[in-house]
Regions:
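STAS-typified acidic loop motif
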Residues: 2-30, 48
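Residues that form or immediately flank small-molecule/cofactor binding pockets and catalytic motifs
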Residues: 10, 82, 104
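Poly-acidic low-complexity segments
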Residues: 21, 47, 119-123
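Amphipathic alpha-helical interaction surfaces in cytosolic regulatory modules
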Residues: 22-97
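A charged, well-structured terminal subsegment
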Residues: 101-129
Length: 129
């Protein structure tokens, strides 16, 4: 399997087990959009620890999910390699997403972010996974 996904602590974790190119980006995009819609996910965390290459379709995947999530959620990327981190810098995505060294840090940060948004809107989030 080239990727996995799971709902975890209010976030959708998407782990990629190979490089992110146009072949994989379209499939992952469809899965993410479906799960976010069905479960009311507010944050998406991409685990890039096994990704060594990302082309423009990977940038498009991240940018598209950012556009859908940025008002009520966030996008995080975990453990990108130097070449992928450079692509994030060159494309400007580093200004839109948060990069973390570990999954634990990303989950903690997204959970706090979700709780803060819920508090701003007058209540705690009550989405169950």
């Amino acid at each position: 399997m080239n990727y996995y996904y799971m709902a975890m602590r209010g976030s959708l974790v998407v782990g990629l087990n190979t490089d992110l190119d146009h072949h994989l980006a379209d499939e992952v995009r469809q899965v993410i959009d479906e799960v976010v819609e069905e479960r009311g996910i507010r944050s998406i965390i991409f685990d890039f620890s096994k990704v060594t290459f990302m082309d423009s379709s990977g940038i498009g995947l991240i940018m598209g999910r950012y556009k859908k999530m940025h008002q009520n959620g966030r996008i995080a990327i975990v453990a990108p390699c130097r070449s992928v981190e450079r692509i994030l810098q060159i494309s400007g995505l580093h200004k839109l997403v948060t990069v973390f060294e570990s999954m634990g840090e990303a989950l903690d940060s997204c959970e706090i972010h979700d709780d803060n948004i819920a508090a701003e809107k007058g209540g705690k989030r009550s989405v169950k996974y």
